[in-house]
A protein has these predicted regions:
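Short aromatic-enriched loop/helix-cap "lid" or pocket-rim segments at secondary-structure transitions
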Residues: 5, 15, 55, 106-107, ...
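AMP-binding (ANL) adenylation modules
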Residues: 47, 218-220
Length: 318
């Protein structure tokens, strides 16, 4: 049985604050995120995303393509409440799919957050104008999480990303100039991927040089355009349909006539090694570690986790 879809909630201010639930049920010090300061708090200021990325689960199955937002006053009220309830918080993360989808709103929100004196981060698309970047930075923005996905323009077209490589380069350069950190995310194995485009993406990542990166494998979630596309084109078969293994390690479910599952899977480790094992990047990480005992402890923990991750992937491959 499939019931009719419920009407989408339009008045987002009707939603209760989530932070009192955190206060009641969570010890936030137990939750770590490699690119955010610790401890941090994360919540939403809106639902939905205007982008039509073929692989993305959230707008296609949950939030929709209209960005429905809480009022700025409602968001600021919750942040102010959370400041008092969690004085130990070092950073707030706004987990909207793309907080920068509405430039006038994010600028106005930033100016109100600036009055509270908080440090914050958010998801962003790599097309934010420099003028907006300045406003956000001057009002507490420290970091963007940016989905670059690939360094190949044709693949960006294939996945309907709505982004051009030159815009991403300019945005990243502006962020570097303004002192805004970037955690860049990339996806290998998207439609149109080849050995050559993987190499192109690795070179692109090292060229633009975000502060940190995350490299994922294309995941054809049921309900997405990518899933339907994969079935129609024979890129997904029953013997390799799982997205993760029993230990949570991500698998490479897609394959192409010119690119096998294992070639896509193995390229993730190659990507990480070539990005992080560069002299300049190593020097940057060491410099961060020497900046404070907290950063030393954090980077050492992350290093252990990183090598554990690589070992798990290598064991899975064999």
């Amino acid at each position: 049985m499939h019931n009719e879809e419920r009407p989408i909630l339009e008045d987002m201010d009707r939603l209760p604050f989530v932070t009192p639930v955190y206060k009641r049920d969570l010890k936030i010090e137990n939750y770590f995120n490699g690119y955010l300061r610790h401890p941090y708090l994360s919540f939403y200021t809106g639902r939905g995303c205007k982008s039509h990325c073929t692989f993305c689960l959230w707008p296609q199955t949950v939030g929709g393509y209209r960005y429905r937002t809480r009022s700025i006053g409602h968001v600021v009220e919750e942040v102010a409440w959370a400041q008092k309830a969690f004085p130990q918080v070092k950073e707030f993360f706004f987990d909207d799919d793309t907080l920068t989808d509405n430039l006038p709103r994010v600028q106005a929100l930033a100016q109100e957050l600036g009055k509270l004196g908080i440090v914050w981060a958010c998801n962003a698309k790599a097309n934010v104008p420099r003028e907006t970047l300045k406003i956000l930075r001057d009002n507490g923005l420290r970091l963007f999480l940016v989905g670059y996905e690939t360094g190949n323009q044709q693949i960006l077209y294939n996945i309907k990303k709505g982004m051009r490589i030159e815009f991403a380069r300019r945005f990243t350069r502006d962020c570097h100039d303004l002192g805004i950190k970037i955690h860049g995310t990339f996806i290998l194995g998207l439609p149109g991927e080849t050995k050559e485009t993987i190499e192109e993406t690795i070179r692109f990542a090292t060229e633009i040089n975000p502060h940190t990166i995350q490299v994922s494998l294309a995941a054809p979630y049921p309900g997405t355009y990518l899933h339907r596309q994969a079935l129609e084109n024979g890129w997904l078969d029953n013997s390799n349909a799982e997205l993760v293994d029993e230990y949570g390690v991500q698998l490479a479910p897609l394959h192409y006539p010119h690119l096998t599952h294992s070639e896509i899977f193995d390229s993730v480790e190659t990507f990480y090694r070539r990005f992080y094992f560069r002299a300049g990047k190593i020097a940057s990480i060491v410099g961060e570690m020497l900046s404070s005992p907290q950063m030393m402890k954090r980077r050492l923990r992350e290093g252990v986790e990183f090598f554990h991750f690589l070992r798990e992937r290598r064991e899975l491959a064999h």
